[in-house]
Amino acid sequence: MSEKNIKGIKFGILSPDEIRKMSVTAIITPDVYDEDGTPIEGSVMDPRLGVIEPGQKCPTCGNTLGNCPGHFGHIELVRPVIHVGLVKHIYEFLKATCRRCGRVKISEDEIEKYSRIYNAIKKRWPSAARRLTEYVKKTAMKAQVCPHCNEKQYKIKLEKPYNFYEERKEGVAKLTPSDIRERLEKIPDSDVEILGYDPTTSRPEWMILTVLPVPPITIRPSIMIESGIRAEDDLTHKLVDIVRINERLKESIDAGAPQLIIEDLWDLLQYHVATYFDNEIPGLPPSKHRSGRPLRTLAQRLKGKEGRFRGNLSGKRVDFSSRTVISPDPNISIDEVGVPEIIAKTLTVPERITPWNIEKLRQFVINGPDKWPGANYVIRPDGRRIDLRYVKDRKELASTLAPGYIIERHLIDGDIVLFNRQPSLHRISMMAHRVRVLKGLTFRLNLLVCPPYNADFDGDEMNLHVPQSEEAIAEAKEIMLVHKNIITPRYGGPIIGAAQDYISGAYLLTVKTTLLTKEEAQQILGVADVKIDLGEPAILAPREYYTGKQVISAFLPKDFNFHGQANVSSGPRLCKNEDCPHDSYVVIKNGILLEGVFDKKAIGNQQPESILHWLIKEYSDEYGKWLMDNLFRVFIRFVELQGFTMRLEDVSLGDDVKKEIYNEIDRAKVEVDNLIQKYKNGELEPIPGRTLEESLENYILDTLDKLRSTAGDIASKYLDPFNFAYVMARTGARGSVLNITQMAAMLGQQSVRGERIKRGYMTRTLPHFKPYDISPEARGFIYSSFRTGLKPTELFFHAAGGREGLVDTAVRTSQSGYMQRRLINALSDLRAEYDGTVRSLYGEVVQVAYGDDGVFPMYSAHGKTVDVNRIFERVVGWKA
């Protein structure tokens, strides 16, 4: 056979002659099997259509199951029927061409002119050619009289799904498929071309079916159910219906049955052919099984998430993969993934024997499939595969191994694997990790790596894939390893970084009140794989003490400079320069942390232009990995030794504080009552562009918002700055000051759709309030805190506000998912060329420079091509 390169694919419509030529037999009988259960010749299960039973030979090609591709048959339709998928095109042809002569309803000169332009541009600029044909169609459809034969044109009406009518003088007449086919046959090839179709592959009359292709048995095999009964495929059921109605129609015509009966059968044939193509046509009842289940016909096999394209071509099930629940493990590297031994023994990596690894691989073969690290298969140089489960003397087999053999060995520590969590919304939802085989049944993941996967440990499952070829392993190692993706391509900041305990530990270690003896410093540094000389202690008498800042400085590069506010720098502890008594402004000079604390702004994940960001960007991602594997463990060790716990007293306020909050509540109530009274008296000043009612709502909301923030300020003022709940909120480790306000002081206004809760009963939200009551408590304002507990009415309003959040989340997820799919489909053909432009498949320029600046965010300084301030700070030690 000669080899040829595929240059392109062209789609068209099968002509009746082509259908007959590719068919091996006509299908004429609706009966499928005889009394013995043998397929009948001439039925939809005719043996000539392909083999589905093992051991049988195909009568057509002589091949057995697996090698026989299957063969088409055909059904000669007694009367033509409309192809339901091409109704739109048929409608356009009927409207754009003359009912008498079949010409396009534009003048000969125009046809000649447009044909010339169309032929010149169709290959080079297909989108422009498409616009031209659309223009020709629209112009032709408007013509009332044919410019070629002067025939008056009647309006064509389509009644979906497939009924065409013509509005004549004498009334509305239905166009049968035969009438339509006659008209379409009259259209000359030159006119077909100018309407945007290729007459060699898509003649318009072929859209009206006279012959129906019957697909091979191989794509619609019958299956045996447990009871021994043979169950046919949905397509086979549909084809039997078509053959049965076709035969009945033929018999009725031959017997000279009344026209009404013939038309009914013709309509029924049209219905069965339409639902054979698509069983979800709007306005057409779906074809069903006896059980009431709709049949899955051709269109259903192709479209949708489970269809052929998305379900089997874009996305496939794969080998060498596993899935299980994930658990946290702060003791493994960010680059590692803990793999259960049972999975490591099931998934294999092919390793070729060389003189250097032969002894190691011999031992794996001796260990066999049940002992880790072992091997499952041996592949000989001749390609024969030996399954070690069935080898009795594995030692003997191991002794025969030689270079050239391939051993499919178990996963071992250090192997490269791909790790993924669905939904995979961006590139770093799939990254490469090194294997660390551990006891247990779950995958272990370092907590720092959760953000790119959007993973948590409340039952999430993740997928692990094992690359099989050296090329795939090398690619994963060089491009996909976790530490090479710490900086996200989304905004050029670190997506992997500290969260929760890490931030709390870093803050408690760096705060200026933390002093450590040499033993304590050694104990917390013991978890890091480093040799560090802390130098002279900061405090020499009465006892020698190191500060937490000294411990952290030991991990920083000696030429690193940084200035910036910490997360705790807000409210009464706000500092904007080095002269800060609150330790909330960070200063690092020549790698020494002189003042300030490490919190979310310094080392947190998803914090661009932070200390962590500049350390990774300026000193390599390898250094970033080392820092996270060592310094971050020190933070966790410190918080373990120090103790970090939250108790009820952390959100309990004293009586004097409560009294202060109650006074504010009384003041706000009076203010709201005054506003309501002013509204009733007509004295309220409306806000420009708002009605009086909307203005009142705005005034009330402003008053209540002020009340909640005042209550929060009062509570914060009296909370101990080392109260751990407050530490979490201020450092950015978890929660916010608002959460503490809600726990300690009050919940505040509950809203639905951005407004106070106003729906419920006819004139009030709940039966506990008077009709037309618009006071704060009657419209969802909660004066209680979580600490004191909610009243029954308050609990109801809180549930209403919470419900909206749940619904909103569910709706947003589906909408954003669909939007992303559409974006991916639209942008998938665009690429950045070597000249820096972004172009489509046809070479059309979409952007002159990628992103208008030609900068990839991952390698930018948080979006900026060059950050001059940072360069100054790095080199000189202060910002420009």
Swiss-Prot record:
Compartments (UniProt record): Cytoplasm
Residue numbers binding Zn(2+) 1:
C58, N63, C68, H71
Q: How is the cofactor bound?
A: Binds 3 Zn(2+) per subunit.
Q: Which domain of life is it from?
A: Archaea
Q: What GO cellular component is one of the record's annotations? A: cytoplasm
Name one matching Pfam family. RNA_pol_Rpb1_2
Give a short account of what the protein does.
DNA-dependent RNA polymerase (RNAP) catalyzes the transcription of DNA into RNA using the four ribonucleoside triphosphates as substrates. Forms the clamp head domain.
**Subunit field text:** (Microbial infection) Interacts with acidianus two-tailed virus protein RIP; this interaction results in the global inhibition of transcription.
Q: What is this protein called?
A: DNA-directed RNA polymerase subunit Rpo1N
Q: Which organism is it from?
A: Saccharolobus solfataricus (strain ATCC 35092 / DSM 1617 / JCM 11322 / P2)
